[in-house]
């Protein structure tokens, strides 16, 4: 029995072919996990005819429901004429204290200040993180006179698996050898195990550690184009990737709004990945950010405002190297790419794993 057959037999109805996601994605600016979620609904089997039918259905859903920014006004018109319409968009929520209600904004549709039910925010707190959550939303339009807000969120469902039976995976693991399971895991992150040696497989899988361990501090530096950011941007709806220039203490930890303390990204996500970390080199990095970061990496907590906050988000630092390893070892060190402000024991001693990204071809 081939590995593919064993996977299909052990996880029937849960397997999605990675090549289908790439086939569907094209130039769409959406994470791969959004497409895999849809493929899982229509193409989770090994029957070629059924897969072909399901693939067409997924393409139809994307064509009809995914909101392209260029088509936003057309979609609004469709909602108005039909009265309601289902869309796929990135949704963010905020609390409007003046009106005492939560309000949503839609990244591609361009709508803001749309009332959103408290039940949706309570069950999906990441909506408040400021980074947005990809959702399937049924959006209604209210006709009539003297209507303050015409848009109405009738249903909202985040694009993520709600229930996972971990025990089932533990039981099915017994059906695989260690090497088979290793290759299976490599497949799940979109890589071909036949193109990697055993060490490269483990280096690639090490990128998953921040996803499965709370408060795991991870760093990977390596050449461009080796997939460092992919795992943190495309794989899971529970992690967030932010670029180097967008990192501030307020965004990561706590933002003060009057007398209120608004929790930052570490309070909502399982993994916060700092991309293009090396681009901060030569810039004046906020001293408050460095101090708060070091405290969080060490103690899983941070002090901002009047309170001490605890969080379980893993921190990941991803960046590119400019030189080869032999050059760095001879002329500087393996941390030469990162900002000078972070090259000190108080920061580096708190990194649990420095993944050698330069070994990935």
Q: Where are each of the predicted segments found?
A:
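Extended, charged/polar low-complexity intrinsically disordered regions
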Residues: 1-188
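A generic structural signal for short, solvent-exposed coil/turn residues
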Residues: 129-131, 153, 212, 307, ...
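Generic structural motif
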Residues: 142-144, 320-321, 358-360
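Alpha-helix initiation and N-capping motif
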Residues: 178-182, 290, 344, 348
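Conserved ASCE/P-loop NTPase catalytic core
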Residues: 192-327, 331-334, 349
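A short helix-turn-beta junction within AAA+ P-loop NTPase domains corresponding to the substrate/partner-engaging
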Residues: 329-360
């Amino acid at each position: 029995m081939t590995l593919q057959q064993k996977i299909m037999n052990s996880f029937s109805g849960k397997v999605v072919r990675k090549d289908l996601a790439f086939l569907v994605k094209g130039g769409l600016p959406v994470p791969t996990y959004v497409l895999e979620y849809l493929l899982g609904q229509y193409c989770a089997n090994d029957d070629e005819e059924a897969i072909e039918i399901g693939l067409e259905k997924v393409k139809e859903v994307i064509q009809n429901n995914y909101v392209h920014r260029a088509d936003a006004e057309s979609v609004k018109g469709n909602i108005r004429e039909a009265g309601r319409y289902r869309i796929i968009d990135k949704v963010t929520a905020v609390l409007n204290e003046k009106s005492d209600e939560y309000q949503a904004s839609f990244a591609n549709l361009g709508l803001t200040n749309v009332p959103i039910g408290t039940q949706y925010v309570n069950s999906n707190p990441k909506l408040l993180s400021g980074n947005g959550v990809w959702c399937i939303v049924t959006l209604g339009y209210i006709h009539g006179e003297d209507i303050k807000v015409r848009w109405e969120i009738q249903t909202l469902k985040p694009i993520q698996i709600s229930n996972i039976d971990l025990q089932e995976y533990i039981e099915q693991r017994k059906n695989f050898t260690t090497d088979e399971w290793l290759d299976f895991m490599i497949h799940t992150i979109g890589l071909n195990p036949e193109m990697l040696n055993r060490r490269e497989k483990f280096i690639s899988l090490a990128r998953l550690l921040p996803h499965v361990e709370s408060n795991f501090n991870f760093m990977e530096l390596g050449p461009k184009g080796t997939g460092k950011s992919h795992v943190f941007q495309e794989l899971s709806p529970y992690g967030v990737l932010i670029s180097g220039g967008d990192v501030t203490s307020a965004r990561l930890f706590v933002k003060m709004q009057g007398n209120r303390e608004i929790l930052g990204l570490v309070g909502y996500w399982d993994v916060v990945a700092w991309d293009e970390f090396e681009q901060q080199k030569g810039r004046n990095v906020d001293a408050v950010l460095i101090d708060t970061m070091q405290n969080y990496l060490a103690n899983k907590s941070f002090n901002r405002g009047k309170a001490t906050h605890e969080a379980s988000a893993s921190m990941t630092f991803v960046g590119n190297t400019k030189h080869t390893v032999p050059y760095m070892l001879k002329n500087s060190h393996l941390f030469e790419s990162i900002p000078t402000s972070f090259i000190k024991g108080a920061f580096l001693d708190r990194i649990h794993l420095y993944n050698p990204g330069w070994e990935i071809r």
